[in-house]
Amino acid sequence: MAPNKPSVKGKSSSKGDSKTGKPLSSASKVNKKNVKRPPPKEVKSKARTESSLLKKTKKREYTEEELGLPKLNMITPVGVVKPKGKKKGKVFVDDQEGMMTILAMVNAEQEGHIESKLQKARQMEEIREARRKEAEARLAQKKSKLDDAKESIRQKKKRKGGSSEDSAADTSAAASGAKSKGKRKSVSFA
């Protein structure tokens, strides 16, 4: 036999203690392995070709009254309550003549828009023509000034025509004066 540890006086062995103390909690519980359960029930799936699965279920069809849809393109008589989804600017006409007058007013307004566009186009064309004429007038004025200057120079030449040196000097002076006005000084940085 195996040697036992010497027991200390005053203390009892642990084996005796366990029996006299609290009862084991595992004894009161039922072991999960020992419990017998009924076998799981097999769920039988039906074949896809079975007639009950192939049948289409009927969906409920709602009437127009149940849905509360307004009737479209209808002339609502006087005294009839307007539908709940009324748009802004919607005009309810009580008779055919009233509807025709409203239609005529709308058409006239649209024609007015078209006429105003045509009128604007005409005005713009007139403005373009006026600008063209002004530009042509300016060019003609410049040409006339240039021609006048040329004529004045020619007249001066004809008056002084006696001395050739003076006329040469005058023409060179006139040319230098014209060049000085036309030519501008330019500065270049190297």
Curated annotation (Swiss-Prot):
Predominantly, its location class is nucleus
**Disordered: where is this region?**
1-67, 114-190
Instruction: Give the record's subunit note.
Output: Component of the 66S pre-ribosomal particle.
Q: Where is the composition biased (Low complexity)?
A: 1-13, 164-179
Can you say what this protein is called? Answer: 60S ribosomal subunit assembly/export protein loc1
- Describe the family membership recorded for this protein in Swiss-Prot or TrEMBL: Belongs to the LOC1 family.
Give a yes or no for keyword Isomerase in this entry: no
Q: Where is the composition biased (Basic and acidic residues)?
A: 39-49, 114-154
User: Coiled-coil intervals in this record?
Assistant: 115-161
Matching entries from InterPro entries are given as: Loc1
Q: Which GO terms describe its molecular function?
A: mRNA binding
Q: Where is the composition biased (Basic residues)?
A: 180-190
Record's GO cellular component, any one? Answer: nucleolus
Q: Tell me which PANTHER family the record gives.
A: 60S RIBOSOMAL SUBUNIT ASSEMBLY/EXPORT PROTEIN LOC1, 60S RIBOSOMAL SUBUNIT ASSEMBLY_EXPORT PROTEIN LOC1
Record localization: Nucleus, Nucleolus
Going by the UniProt record, its keywords in alphabetical order are:
Coiled coil, mRNA transport, Nucleus, Ribosome biogenesis, Transport
Any one biological process term the GO annotation gives? mRNA transport
Q: Where are the transmembrane segments?
A: none
